[in-house]
C-alpha cells in the first residue's frame, strides 16, 4: 500500500518514460487506499459546480488533479483530445456513462456502458473507447475523485447528448496546489 505522496512520486517516475503503460498505471492507482487526511488540502468544493483542483503538473507530461462533486453534479459528455484518462474514487461514488462517437449529425449519442465506481474504484478512458460523462448521482453526499491525464490538455470537446453537437471547451482549474485561483477579470476563468 502506498501513501498519497508516494502515489504522486511514483506517477512522476512512471512518466519519465515516453510510453504510457495503461496496466502499470491502473495497478499503481489501485494500490493507493484513499485517506482523506492525505489529500484533503487539495479537495476544494464549490456548491454550484464541480471543481478541478490541480495537484501536480508532472513536468508538463501529465496533469494530476482532484475533482470535487457536490450532490447531483455531473460533467458534460466529453472527449479527451487524445489524452489517456485515469480516475480513482477517493470518496463517495461516481457513475461513468460511456458513449459511442456521433455517427451522424443531429442524432442522439448511443450509450455503450454505465458503471458506478465506489471508494477506491479505478477507471480508464481514452478517445478510442469513445466519449464519457462522470456523475455524482447522490442527492445528499459529495464525491471526490483523482484524475490523471496524459498528456495534459487545456481544451476538450463537449457533446450534446440529444443531438451529438460538438462544442470546444477551455479546461481550467478551480485551484492549484491547494490554493483557490482568483480568476476575477481573467479571460482564462470565464
Swiss-Prot record:
GO MF annotations in UniProt: cysteine dioxygenase activity; ferrous iron binding
GO biological process, one term: taurine biosynthetic process
Position(s), cross-link 3'-(S-cysteinyl)-tyrosine (Cys-Tyr): 85-149
Record keywords: Dioxygenase, Iron, Metal-binding, Oxidoreductase, Thioether bond
Involved pathway(s): Organosulfur biosynthesis; taurine biosynthesis; hypotaurine from L-cysteine: step 1/2
Disulfide bonds: none
Binding-site residues, Fe cation: 78, 80, 132
Pfam families in alphabetical order: CDO_I
Keyword Transmembrane helix attributed: no
InterPro entries referenced in this protein's UniProt entry, alphabetically: CDO_1, RmlC-like_jellyroll, RmlC_Cupin_sf
PANTHER family (alphabetical): CYSTEINE DIOXYGENASE, CYSTEINE DIOXYGENASE TYPE 1
Family to which the UniProt record says this protein belongs: Belongs to the cysteine dioxygenase family.
Protein name: Cysteine dioxygenase
UniProt organism field: Caenorhabditis briggsae
Amino acid at each position: 500500500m502506498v501513501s498519497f505522496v508516494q502515489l504522486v512520486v511514483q506517477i512522476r517516475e512512471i512518466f519519465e518514460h515516453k510510453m504510457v503503460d495503461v496496466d502499470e498505471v491502473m495497478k499503481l492507482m489501485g494500490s493507493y487506499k484513499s485517506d482523506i487526511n492525505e489529500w484533503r488540502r487539495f479537495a476544494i468544493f464549490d456548491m454550484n459546480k464541480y471543481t478541478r483542483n490541480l495537484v501536480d503538473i508532472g513536468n508538463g507530461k501529465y496533469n494530476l488533479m482532484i475533482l470535487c462533486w457536490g450532490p447531483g453534479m455531473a460533467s458534460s459528455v466529453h472527449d479527451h483530445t487524445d489524452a489517456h484518462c485515469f480516475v480513482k474514487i477517493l470518496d463517495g461514488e461516481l457513475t461513468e456513462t460511456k458513449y459511442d462517437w456521433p455517427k451522424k449529425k443531429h442524432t442522439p449519442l448511443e450509450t455503450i456502458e454505465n458503471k458506478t465506481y465506489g471508494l477506491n474504484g479505478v477507471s480508464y478512458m481514452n478517445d478510442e473507447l469513445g466519449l464519457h460523462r462522470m456523475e455524482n448521482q447522490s442527492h445528499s453526499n459529495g464525491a471526490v475523485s483523482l484524475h490523471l491525464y496524459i498528456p495534459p490538455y487545456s481544451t476538450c470537446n463537449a457533446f450534446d447528448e440529444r443531438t451529438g453537437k460538438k462544442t470546444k471547451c477551455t479546461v481550467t482549474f478551480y485551484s492549484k496546489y491547494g490554493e483557490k485561483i482568483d480568476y476575477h477579470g481573467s479571460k482564462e476563468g470565464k
